[in-house]
């Protein structure tokens, strides 16, 4: 069982080591001005391209976290993210890196936050719609 570090750079290194040079892995780092956690990126989002609903990720994960954070009075980024996700998406909190990796491989999105030893795993699976085939 690999644990999640409170240092976001350590989590990024773990994810990059596990997934290597996979071309389908999407990693996004966000540094939010109101965070007081030093030089580390405040948020790190990882998912697999093609397995996830991009519109869901952009509109219900990234936009609320990055844009709405600027207008909030809360000093706790973790609580802000949980309140955003609680309103718009199915999510779990995970403290085991192995479980986070398995979730990403299933099509979920993982969000790491500086200063937290947990990740938020958001259900973001996208299944392609197939047309009805004629019987032969």
For every predicted segment, state its role.
Residues 1-136:
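Membrane-embedded alpha-helical signal segments
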């Amino acid at each position: 069982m690999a644990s999640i570090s409170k240092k976001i750079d350590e989590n990024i290194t773990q994810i990059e080591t596990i997934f290597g040079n996979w071309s389908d892995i999407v990693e996004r780092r966000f540094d939010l001005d109101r965070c007081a956690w030093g030089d580390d990126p405040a948020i790190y989002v990882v998912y697999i391209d093609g397995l996830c609903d991009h519109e869901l990720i952009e509109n219900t994960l990234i936009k609320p976290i990055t844009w709405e954070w600027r207008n909030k009075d809360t000093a706790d980024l973790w609580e802000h993210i949980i309140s955003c996700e609680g309103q718009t998406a199915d999510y779990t909190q995970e403290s085991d890196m192995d479980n986070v990796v398995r979730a990403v491989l299933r099509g979920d999105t993982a969000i790491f936050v500086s200063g937290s030893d947990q990740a938020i795993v958001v259900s973001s699976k996208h299944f392609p719609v197939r047309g009805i085939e004629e019987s032969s």
